[in-house]
Amino acid sequence: MKYFRLIWTGLWRKKVRTIFTMLSIIVAFLLFGMLQGIDTTFKQLVNQGRLNVLVTQNPAGLPLPLADLSQIQAVHGVTRVTYRALFIGDYQSLRNIMIVLPIDPDNFFAENPQFSVSQRNRDVFLHTRTGMLVMKSVAERLGWKVGDRIPIQALNARKKDGTATWTFDFVGTFDIPNSPASEQPILLMNYDYFDTGRATDTGTVQLYQETIADASQAATIGNSIDNLFANSPNRTHTETERASAQSQLAQLGDLDFFVEAIVAAAFATLLLLTGTTLMQAYRERIREFAVMKTIGFTDRTISVLVLSEAILLTLGSALVGLLIARALLPAIGSALSRYGLPGLELPGIVLGVGVGFAVLLALVSAVPAALRAERLSIVDALAMR
């Protein structure tokens, strides 16, 4: 620490160059933090998918008959089955998108324990045909109170009377703790209310969800379910809940490749920029280093000072970029959650990896300049003009 003032002074020898270099590093690590935060959030959603729960859907995304329920329940290895439909709606405007899930209230919560809901709310919902349960964060944001009558404008589920407005009795809230999905605008309604009121696709569901006794038999049980409907017009595709989530994520494209390609390009450019800047700073200070050696600074001390300047510049700027990303991601996720996207965050492990990258970047870009400074001849340096 006794050389910190010297390191700090050397770092700001050319203020404009230092500021522009810092800004470049901040932007690069801000980009790294944002992209890795988004990627990690989606991976977390996928990893929360269970291996002992199967999801049965039509391969083309078409609705499946509710009449298939009894056949699926009879498959060996299946212990419990629930189902749900889906439509997208909005509250007052498209700024408040709602993911509406008409569910089987008798089995849905047993099948999905990640939905945390009080027994009181569950009982009232079960016995209120027009009742709805809403994600706690959404109810708080919109100021809904238990007992309110809430109109939801459906975007893809018209009613038999020709209108698209579904009116619900708000009976309570639920939460999905420790999950990015806790910010999503999910609304649960009774399937019976939805099915008897809709104009089309009556008696159908979006998917079935099966709990199985042995996760190691998931593929076998899934094939047994699909074989039941192999020759029917309503073919099915059954996979684990985790595989289903992965399939949905894959529809966005190869997110890993996208993130890695952008980050690699940014860091390659940053390495070139930082290395060039540090080498230029070294050349400008050759005579200064020679004088320092003359008055007693060792070769090793000079090289350590050069490395320390690079680490301070890179690590300090990287931390600023990462902390900005950590502050921005939850705010962006909260803003986007009203459009149905999950909450976003920057996990500590990504922050740690970013710090490691910053130190590595500093060492790789500064080592050539540090070695030259260590091997610098006093006589040759003082003779240079």
PLM region spans:
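Short cytosolic juxtamembrane segments of multi-pass membrane proteins
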Residues: 372-385
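Hydrophobic, regular-secondary-structure patches
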Residues: 26-100, 117-128, 140-141, 223, ...
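Basic-flanked hydrophobic alpha-helices used for secretion and membrane insertion
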Residues: 139, 144-239
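Transmembrane alpha-helical interface segments in multi-pass membrane proteins
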Residues: 279, 283, 287-333, 353, ...
